[in-house]
Amino acid sequence: MKINFKAAKKLREILVQAVYQFLFNNQDTSEIYDQFVKEHQNKKIDLEILNSKLRSIELNSQKIDQAIDKTDFDISKIDLIDKAILYVAFEEIIFGELDHPVVIDEAIRLSKKFSNPDSFKFLNAIIDKYIKL
């Protein structure tokens, strides 16, 4: 299902927040999804895609961790918000249809919005290294 660029950007922002909550609270994604539906029901986002990606991240979190580990970066030392951004990016790389440059650009944008000012360099290095494997 295709969505427009602006809606896709907003969806990724909400997805990062939902994944952060999943990682922080170790909470079932169906509960997180229900909460986000209530909070964002009047916004123009595709809740079906949000649910699908959130479930994919939950079900494939070990695969995503293994993919990040292949880059020789210690997943346990990555800040939680950066880990959430990486989970969204790696889900799109491994299971999605987006071109890799788009995934990298979006991870950088999300990092600049949600994380510390220099995190985007670190995230870019991890994603770039994985893509080149």
Map each language-model feature to its residues.
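N-terminal interaction/assembly modules
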Residues: 1-113, 117-120, 124-133
